[in-house]
Amino acid sequence: RQRTEKIGFLFSFPVTTISEYIARLITGVVIAAEQESYNLVLYPLKDDPLEQLTRICRAREVDGLLLLARAQIDPAISLLEKESVPFVLVGRRFEQPHISFITPDFVDGARQVTRHLLALGHRRIAYTTRPALGITSRDRLEGYRQTLAEAGIPFDPQLVVETTTQPNSSYQAMNRLLDLPNPPTAVFAIHDLVALECLQAAADRHCRVPDDVAIVGFDDWSMSLTTQPPLTTVRTPLYEMGRQATHTLLNHVTEPDLPAVQTILPVELVVRQSTAGSSPV
């Protein structure tokens, strides 16, 4: 089979909400691809991703694919395996040992957040989950639950609230938490954008952050430096993830029989004023 000297990057997010995430990742991908004289083709996933994927595979448009997809990925994986197209999952892990992936350590990120809040004296720590994100959301929930259990704090399902990508979903979730008879003193948001709405909800209720409620995000988007107050968050190595994913993919392209490479990259808690020095009353 003749090589195209191109790799594809498939992503299934609305481009508007995820632009910074994609941009950082793609920078790493492009630089690694250029080192190997490869070009990059971007494929925003359409309404019928399997049909789109089938066309890409059959037309042999690219030599391999990077898949940035969060949930419902199994049919795509089956198709790529059937078509013998090399691929690497980016930004999530996968349970099967023969699938290559690279992901931030979501479990440890959640553990670092929860440990930080516990060290400040918080005991009622809420978590805003997003079931549509699949395993990446469950991994964070797992890290949060593990760390509470290690501290001897019983898990309270009332403190886990679901959010969606709908506008104001996270704002409403924060209000539900603050309306509880015994509200949380700290909130761990699944993403910085979610944390932004939580900050707004707190401000609208004249709740002081971090004095009345501490708030933590995830991903360390640039806006987290300029929120009021600046946001404690978890920095994920997006550039490095893109770079390593590309090298792994190109190794699979040149040597199809190589075993799968499963990489979990460390993440870093970045402490700012949204938690700094806060302690529950």
Task: Describe each region flagged by the PLM.
Residues 62-68, 126-128, 160, 181-191, ...:
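Periplasmic-binding protein-like
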Residues 1-5, 279-281:
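N-terminal helix-turn-helix DNA-binding module of bacterial transcription factors
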Residues 3, 61, 121, 156, ...:
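Short loop/turn motifs at secondary-structure junctions
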Residues 12-24, 42-51, 102-112, 128-173, ...:
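Hinge/beta->alpha junction and helix N-cap segments in small-molecule ligand-binding domains
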Residues 5-115, 119, 179:
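Alpha-helical recognition/docking segments in bacterial nutrient-uptake
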Residues 171-281:
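Flexible loop/turn connectors
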